[in-house]
């Protein structure tokens, strides 16, 4: 379970970086050269999703829980926004959903 969660976390970081870099270009006037690492991050994101031993839809559903937590971590660390009790509660619920889905992978 820990290996799966860490893999989902790495996957989420790649997806967030792959979305954040073009955001910097479009919203903040950063160089369009950021599209090069964007493409690499998104390609790595897709590849990482293929490393899970479950059906793709089940992987995407479980991944969503870790993505929510990673995005909130990004909100705190990169954007400098303090998390609210609602953020923490939502992250806990999303992570519980991910754990339930992953626990059932071998039983499906």
Curated annotation (Swiss-Prot):
Q: Which domain of life is it from?
A: Bacteria
Q: Which membrane topology describes this protein?
A: Multi-pass membrane protein
SUPFAM superfamilies in alphabetical order: Multidrug resistance efflux transporter EmrE
**Which keywords annotate this record?**
Cell inner membrane, Cell membrane, Membrane, Transmembrane, Transmembrane helix
**Any one annotated GO CC term:** plasma membrane
Mostly located where? membrane
Q: Does the keyword Cell inner membrane apply?
A: yes
Residue ranges crossing the lipid bilayer per the database entry:
6-26, 29-49, 61-81, 86-106
Alphabetical list of Pfam families matching this protein: UPF0060
Q: Where in the cell is it found?
A: Cell inner membrane
Q: InterPro entries annotated for this entry?
A: UPF0060 (IPR003844)
Family per UniProt? Belongs to the UPF0060 family.
Name of the protein in question: UPF0060 membrane protein KPN78578_15550
**Species of provenance:** Klebsiella pneumoniae subsp. pneumoniae (strain ATCC 700721 / MGH 78578)
Q: What is the lineage of its organism?
A: Bacteria, Pseudomonadati, Pseudomonadota, Gammaproteobacteria, Enterobacterales
């Amino acid at each position: 379970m820990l290996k799966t969660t860490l893999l989902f976390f790495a996957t989420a970081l790649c997806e967030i970086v792959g979305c954040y870099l073009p955001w910097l270009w479009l919203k903040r006037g950063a160089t369009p050269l950021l599209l090069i690492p964007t493409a690499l991050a998104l390609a790595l994101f897709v590849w990482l999703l293929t490393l899970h031993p479950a059906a793709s839809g089940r992987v995407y559903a479980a991944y969503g829980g870790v993505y929510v937590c990673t995005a909130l971590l990004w909100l705190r660390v990169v954007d400098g926004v303090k998390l609210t009790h609602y953020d923490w509660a939502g992250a806990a619920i999303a992570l519980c959903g991910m754990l339930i889905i992953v626990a059932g992978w071998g039983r499906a």
